Amino acid sequence: MNFLNFSILIFAYLLGSINSAIIVCYIFRLPSPRSVGSGNPGTTNVLRIGGKVPAAITLIFDILKGLVPVVIAKVLTGNEFITACTALYAILGHIFPIFFGFKGGKGIATLVGTLFGFSWILGLIFVITWLCVAIITRYSSLSALVATFIASFSVIFTSDLQVAAPFLIIAIIILVKHKGNIQRLISGQESKIGDKAKAKNDSN
């Protein structure tokens, strides 16, 4: 691995480590997303805590955290594998941020950015899948999980297995991060889209 590739991966991780949910809630003088609602510093919890505007800002920044480094890797290296690894590092930064004690969000919005940066078709697959599942079930977590796996496995059909591997690793990490959501989905206790923040309970 040359210096350029290494630098891009480090940049992706550090950018991913900037937790926009925590920063946005601080700017809007809202409770910390780590102590209210689900306790998850992500877009869905910010929506429950502060409404549409703070959530939209959080969503946009989280998407850009994935999009920007992947596009940079794509343009500067022209290497699909390095670009896919850049996506993985951006997700790792978001989920395990060095600036916030390695306790971050669940990576969905940042994944959307990486997918659009890697291939707009993959990004579109994610968005369409998420919307379809969300409209039918109103479960944000279920929509995210289904869309994540469909989009990640779709990489296999557009690139070789080596390139797809980082996205499959991302899917597994996101699945593990949603363990609590999966348990509540099974028990029928998972929060639905539109539910207001209550006591901290680890939902998405």
Swiss-Prot record:
One Pfam family here: G3P_acyltransf
GO molecular function, one term: acyl-phosphate glycerol-3-phosphate acyltransferase activity
Membrane topology qualifier: Multi-pass membrane protein
Pathway: Lipid metabolism; phospholipid metabolism
Keyword Lipid biosynthesis part of the UniProt annotation: yes
Subunit structure, as described in the record: Probably interacts with PlsX.
Domain of life where this protein originates: Bacteria
Transmembrane parts of this sequence: 8-28, 53-73, 81-101, 116-136, 155-175
Substrates-to-products reaction catalysed: an acyl phosphate + sn-glycerol 3-phosphate = a 1-acyl-sn-glycero-3-phosphate + phosphate
Enzyme class: transferase
Entry's family note: Belongs to the PlsY family.
EC numbers for this chain: 2.3.1.275
Location (main, coarse): membrane
Keywords: Cell inner membrane, Cell membrane, Lipid biosynthesis, Lipid metabolism, Membrane, Phospholipid biosynthesis, Phospholipid metabolism, Transferase, Transmembrane, Transmembrane helix
GO BP term, example: phospholipid biosynthetic process
The protein's name: Glycerol-3-phosphate acyltransferase
InterPro entries per the UniProt record, alphabetical: G3P_acylTferase_PlsY (IPR003811)
Physiological role: Catalyzes the transfer of an acyl group from acyl-phosphate (acyl-PO(4)) to glycerol-3-phosphate (G3P) to form lysophosphatidic acid (LPA). This enzyme utilizes acyl-phosphate as fatty acyl donor, but not acyl-CoA or acyl-ACP.
The UniProt record lists the keyword Lipid metabolism: yes
GO cellular component term, pick one: plasma membrane
Protein's cellular compartments: Cell inner membrane
